[in-house]
Amino acid sequence: MKKLMVVLSLIAAAWAEEQNKLVHGGPCDKTSHPYQAALYTSGHLLCGGVLIHPLWVLTAAHCKKPNLQVFLGKHNLRQRESSQEQSSVVRAVIHPDYDAASHDQDIMLLRLARPAKLSELIQPLPLERDCSANTTSCHILGWGKTADGDFPDTIQCAYIHLVSREECEHAYPGQITQNMLCAGDEKYGKDSCQGDSGGPLVCGDHLRGLVSWGNIPCGSKEKPGVYTNVCRYTNWIQKTIQAK
């Protein structure tokens, strides 16, 4: 199988102007990702996102752009699919403590113009609320750049595992906060990359992380991807959604 590189991260202020991608993955099953969102700006894929409520999509704060369009129910970006829905964003809420330079608190909520019509191919993903959850087997997905430098038509998936905080801090000395976690694959270098930012890290059928930043080039066996640690934000997410 053709190996794909998943670069789900942008590094430093300049990174936030790029997009992320998947490395060493393969095509996802069409029914395996009903929560996945594709964020577009000016007709081009910008980032991934996650449907967590019929009216709300969660993504990375560095994906903030004007006039975002959100697509749900997508599998092949080059085709118009009967399952797809498109919505504009009426409200973007970046975490108040987001720091673009360090990528700390890299999380944002997007309120859709209208509720998503839930179906087999459009469903919200539950949040991981337990930061001590020990499910280490995870997967990442997105339409980001692959190992051969192309952007795939169909969404790609890769299985990875959580990396201990000690290993994470060793890979990125002085850069990892409690609001971040690392995941990767030391055997094949499976990773997120350009075009995958803001997309989900799914562990045990719950949203554990959001693609945030990492090593450039993507897919290093020694440098795992860095993700926003979603369990740290469940209260903020709930309060934001419930706010008038």
Swiss-Prot record:
Free-text tissue specificity from the UniProt record: In fluids, highest levels found in milk of lactating women followed by cerebrospinal fluid, nipple aspirate fluid and breast cyst fluid. Also found in serum, seminal plasma and some amniotic fluids and breast tumor cytosolic extracts. Not detected in urine. At the tissue level, highest concentrations found in glandular tissues such as salivary glands followed by lung, colon, fallopian tube, placenta, breast, pituitary and kidney. Not detected in skin, spleen, bone, thyroid, heart, ureter, liver, muscle, endometrium, testis, pancreas, seminal vesicle, ovary, adrenals and prostate.
InterPro entries per UniProt: Peptidase_S1_PA, Peptidase_S1_PA_chymotrypsin, Peptidase_S1A, Trypsin_dom, TRYPSIN_HIS, TRYPSIN_SER
Pfam families for the chain: Trypsin
Post-translational events: Inactivated by autolytic cleavage after Arg-80.
Primary location recorded for the protein, binned into one broad class: secreted
Stored CDD domains: Tryp_SPc
Regulation: Inhibited by a range of serine protease inhibitors including soybean trypsin inhibitor, benzamidine and serpins. Activated by a range of glycosaminoglycans including chondroitin sulfate, dermatan sulfate, heparan sulfate and heparin.
Cell compartment(s), UniProt: Secreted; Nucleus, Nucleolus; Cytoplasm; Mitochondrion
Entry's EC annotation: 3.4.21.-
Cystines in this chain: C28-C157, C47-C63, C131-C231, C138-C203, C168-C182, C193-C218
Propeptide cleavage-removed residue intervals: 17-21
SMART domains the record matches: Tryp_SPc (SM00020)
Single GO molecular function: serine-type endopeptidase activity
Site (Cleavage): R80, E81
Glycosylation sites: N134
PANTHER family tied to this protein: KALLIKREIN-6, KALLIKREIN-RELATED
Protein name, UniProt field: Kallikrein-6
Name of the gene: KLK6
